[in-house]
């Protein structure tokens, strides 16, 4: 956590954190974990709900899922600055696996519940498979293979560039301009070691770092989500579906094939 926070401080980058409630409420560790999350908010970052136990919506009963979302929101609400010494901010919810239920009924029920709670669905426009790189990276470190860990790190940063090349071009092809990008990352060892390098590369591409609230103020984010599916495709692809534009999902940069074996 400290390495992530330091990298964000170094690049003056605000982060929006999506918390799984049961990972905050741990026997014998709850108070310590709550204090850590509150420190993130004191640093100027925003805390949001990612459910209580990370269920897949399409594989969970609707009532049980909505109860899980509500329970997760209660955990996060208990962490937010009750004294409001920091500015208030909109609350977002990111569905685990970005699984939106797989049916219109479930999708609409979730949106209705979020709207009633004054919580917004959280979009993203790109990711760089960080959780998959993390599997290989952590295994290499556990095996003491520093050379492989370094090679994975380099591939990870190269993947970042490929993902941004694609997302920027897809934005131009969709809107004739570049919309603010929302990068999905996970708190893991890989990013603890390399978030500074990630932010440096984005800064070199000309990006400035803003909150999710600021990014989603762009008119593109008001376009309806054209997908009710179970997979975590980016909102650029979802908007294209809504706008009736050709599917470009198959053009996404592939995950490096050579990494599949080390990650096993």
Report the location of each language-model feature.
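Short, basic, helix/turn surface patches
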Residues: 41-49, 73-80, 146-164, 233-255, ...
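Glycine-enriched alpha-helix->loop->beta-strand junction motifs that scaffold or abut catalytic
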Residues: 43-47, 115-120
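Active-site beta->alpha N-cap acidic-glycine motif
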Residues: 1-98, 103, 183, 201
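A mature extracytoplasmic/lumenal domain signature
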Residues: 19-23, 51-53, 97, 125-128, ...
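Short low-complexity, flexible loop/linker segments enriched in glycine and/or proline
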Residues: 31-33, 63-65, 136-140, 223-228
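Alpha-helical scaffold elements lining the catalytic groove of polysaccharide deacetylases
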Residues: 55-81, 103-117, 125-177, 191-194
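Generic beta-sheet signal
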Residues: 179-185
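C-terminal domain-boundary segment and adjacent tail
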Residues: 15, 25, 123, 189-264
């Amino acid at each position: 956590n400290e390495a992530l926070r330091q990298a964000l401080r170094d690049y003056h980058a605000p982060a929006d954190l999506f918390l799984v409630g049961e990972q905050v409420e741990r026997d014998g560790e709850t108070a310590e974990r709550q204090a850590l999350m509150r420190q993130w908010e004191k640093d100027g970052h925003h805390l949001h709900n990612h459910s209580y136990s990370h269920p897949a919506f399409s594989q969970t009963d609707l009532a049980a899922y909505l109860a899980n979302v509500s329970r997760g929101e209660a955990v996060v609400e208990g962490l937010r600055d009750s004294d409001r010494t920091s500015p208030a901010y909109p609350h977002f919810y990111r569905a685990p696996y970005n699984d939106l239920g797989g049916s219109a009924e479930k999708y609409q029920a979730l949106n209705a519940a979020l709207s009633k709670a004054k919580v917004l669905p959280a979009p993203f426009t790109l990711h760089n498979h960080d959780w998959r790189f993390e599997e290989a990276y952590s295994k290499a470190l556990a095996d003491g293979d520093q050379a492989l860990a370094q090679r994975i790190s380099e591939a990870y940063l190269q993947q970042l560039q490929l993902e941004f090349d694609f997302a920027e071009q897809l934005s131009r092809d969709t809107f004739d301009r570049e919309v603010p990008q929302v990068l999905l990352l996970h708190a893991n060892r890989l990013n603890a070691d390399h978030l500074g390098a990630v932010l440096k590369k984005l800064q070199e591409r000309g990006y400035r770092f803003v909150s999710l609230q600021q990014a989603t103020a762009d008119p593109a984010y008001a376009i309806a989500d054209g997908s009710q599916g179970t997979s975590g495709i980016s909102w650029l692809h979802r908007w294209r579906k809504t706008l009736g534009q050709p599917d470009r999902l198959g053009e996404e940069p592939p995950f490096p094939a050579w990494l599949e074996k080390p990650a096993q």
